[in-house]
Amino acid sequence: MSNVRVSNGSPSLERMDARQAEYPKPSACRNLFGPVNHEELTRDLEKHCRDMEEASQRKWNFDFQNHKPLEGKYEWQEVEKGSLPEFYYRPPRPPKGACKVPAQESQDVSGNRQAVPLIGSQANTEDTHLVDQKTDTSDNQTGLAEQCPGIRKRPATDDSSPQNKRANRTEENVSDGSPNAGSVEQTPKKPGLRRRQT
């Protein structure tokens, strides 16, 4: 690299090293209008909120701060909760990305629903029926904020190997009198396509 020449237009390496050490290059993200005055910004925001509140009071003749009607062109009447449509008093829906865990079903960490067998008079001795395990809603909602595994559409598989779509034949089936005892696996054949003549 001794043959490399630095042109006169570019600064020498010594000058670049000195400049980087003393004065770092300003970042690409710059404040175009100077530093932010947070006190002035807070005052402007409070003034804007007051102006909006006063405009709403004049428009609807209602004091939204004290929840009382004012004199004006509208006549406010108090009504019973039962006479209103449900959407006026029901709690708001959670945001779309929020975690939903049903209260009736408990899930393990991988998202599989747990099931318990029925005990006592409800259970049959020949075949055991499985039901979803019911949990207390207060127990279930205490940890909603901390852990949100999400609900899986299908349960997680226990085995790590993917399922093979080919029809596997076990060795005991092969030795049961099949003509080709050497092959362990057989690919199923598609039936021939039937063409309709019109």
UniProtKB/Swiss-Prot annotation:
Q: Which GO terms describe its molecular function?
A: cyclin binding; cyclin-dependent protein serine/threonine kinase inhibitor activity; protein kinase binding; protein phosphatase binding; protein-containing complex binding; protein-folding chaperone binding
Q: Which Pfam families match?
A: CDI
Modified positions (Phosphotyrosine) are: Y74, Y88, Y89
Localization, per the record, is: Nucleus; Cytoplasm; Endosome
Q: Which InterPro entries match?
A: CDI_dom (IPR003175), CDI_dom_sf (IPR044898)
Question: What's the superkingdom here?
Answer: Eukaryota
In this chain, where does the modification Phosphothreonine occur?
T157, T170, T187, T198
What segment(s) does the record annotate as region Disordered?
1-22, 87-198
Name this protein carries in UniProt: Cyclin-dependent kinase inhibitor 1B
Q: Which organism is it from?
A: Felis catus (Cat)
